[in-house]
Amino acid sequence: MAPSSLLLSVGSLIASSLASATSLQIREQSQSYQLTESWQGESFINDWNFFDRGDPTNGYVTYVNQSVAESSGLVKVTQSGSFYMGVDYESKLNPDGPGRESVRIESKKYYTQGLYVVDIAHMPGSICGTWPAFWSVGANWPHDGEIDIIEGVNKHDANEIVLHTSGSCDVAGSHDMTGSLTSGECGDASGTIGCVVKGTQGSAGDPFNAQGGGVYAIEWTDSFLKIWFFPRNSIPASITAGKPDSSAFGTPMAHLQGTCDFAERFKEQKFILDTTFCGDWAGNVFGESGCPLSDASSPMRSCVDYVAQNPAAFKEAYWEINSIKIYQLGAAPAPATVASPNTASEVHSASELAPATQTEKPTVPTAAETTVVPPASQTSTVAEETPIAPLATAATVTAVNPAPPATQPTAEPATAVTVTDGGDSFRTIFLTSTTTICPEAQSSSSAAAHGGNKNAPVGAVPGQPSGADAVGNPNPSTTTEAVAETETSQPELTAGGISELPKSAPAPTASQPTSEFKPSDVPDVPKPSPEAEHPAPPAAAGSSIINTPSSSAIFGSSTAVGTFTSLARVSRPTGGATFVPTIATATGSPTVGEDGSSGSATASATLTAPTGILFTAGARKLSVGLSGLVGALAVAALA
């Protein structure tokens, strides 16, 4: 096997392996949970709202705002970086006055299905009169649902998981769980009890804190809700590594799944962390929990009296959260970016679109044509020069959205003009021509050029998808072709024909058609389109008219400036561009002028793309001198 074939085979094998590995990686990511949001330390204070209104559960509590909570030390970031949220445990209160100060915070955003990992170092202990909870609720209760992830009252030592929603939502399926399902109907059709799972001992209260806390993991999908509790010394390695794998978590403490449509009954939820006192649940079961009754006939009154008169009992009624992390299937979504009005791209989220970027069709200027007073035959040299100098003569360029101002005339000649709209650059390259006339009869080209219909519009064929535009002329015997050019390409250059020159440029109107051009359609090596080789009849499009006087004749020679227009996508002005020489030869003869003038001449043109900047004084003299010498020899031979 030849060395080149062996290298090709090895390269193909490597490319195939890389492609397979990439596909596998993408497939694994789409099937695994990826971190999308995380709260820890200061972010609980900055990214959550402080609730300071009356308690919806009718508790004996005063929720304070962020300023009071921070100044009184009810919330803070610990030295270890965890978030502390406690209650007032110093003040004795009037049972008939405002309740004990506490904190309730709520996430600023709503969240939907995913995997939620909550690392808790400490939660309120098993204290009479307390009702701590970490839960979520939809915007429209009960229709959007409520999930009580961690909840307990008074001397509780086990978590109680409760779900609430509207209508009927049965989760009484036969699924393995370590907790005990005591009610399988989550909907309000059966009252406000909801579906209840009583967790294992040590999953809340004092036993939870004694083992250094632990981790709760909640997996919420269209068809089920699972909740795991892992004591501090039993946290799965995948959670510790930041790549949780719920399939390896083992049996959950709660597995709620049945005929209930979770996608319909549980909508987007906000998270809430709070500690209240007494209220509808803790107050009404105060005596049943083994707490002291000051009034045997009123558990609620007994609860309020205890909370008001025993501040020190609530020193351990605080939350200490290491972190809350949200994971979702697939890659983390990217934020949507709206491009500025001058660009045609709009970046959307990766989760919304298969392609990361959607490109709209920009509106671009119509093809521009430049006509030059013709000599009978010409030799043209193309050169590009940057930075761009102003035009030597007046030029009007028609563009659409936004319209750039017309270029003002200056005394210095230019070799190129670039009009930029957003990320697309439209460049007009000027051709310096040196002409030698070898007449068979007296030519009247100048008369023909200025005769006839002076206001005839200059035609243009709409832009081609290939990136090259063809420009037509009313005279079928002459053509002008626009050449698409890029910095690294070798464009084919076709010598343009001679057309008559109007005295003034036609004024653009609102009805002028515009061509559509997609930057992605510009090929690396532009090729003339069929329309460029055989121009279509002229269309009423805007054009650029550049009046360019010929240079003085030397030995029967003259110079003129022609142009072609380049449609090339460039990211910034280019300098010192280098082109590979390309030579094209065209022949033609002047036509009979509309004013009756006639004449004939043979013409030959050689169009050369130089390898460097040729518009210098020396280059101009050299070009004219060689052409003049050839012209002199030709005249002598004819004579």
Curated annotation (Swiss-Prot):
InterPro entries: ConA-like_dom_sf, GH16, Glycosyl_Hydrlase_16
Predominant localisation class: membrane
Disordered: annotated span: 337-384, 442-545
Active site annotation, chain numbering: E146, E151
Lipid-conjugated positions (GPI-anchor amidated alanine): A617
Enzyme class: hydrolase
Keywords: Carbohydrate metabolism, Cell membrane, Cellulose degradation, Glycoprotein, Glycosidase, GPI-anchor, Hydrolase, Lipoprotein, Membrane, Polysaccharide degradation, Signal
Subcellular location: Cell membrane
A molecular-function term among this protein's GO annotations: endo-1,3(4)-beta-glucanase activity
Residue stretches of biased makeup (Polar residues): 339-348
Glycosylation sites: N65
GO aspect biological process, one term: cellulose catabolic process
Protein role: Mixed-linked glucanase involved in the degradation of complex natural cellulosic substrates.
Name of the protein in question: Probable endo-1,3(4)-beta-glucanase ACLA_073210
Lineage, highest ranks first: Eukaryota, Fungi, Dikarya, Ascomycota, Pezizomycotina
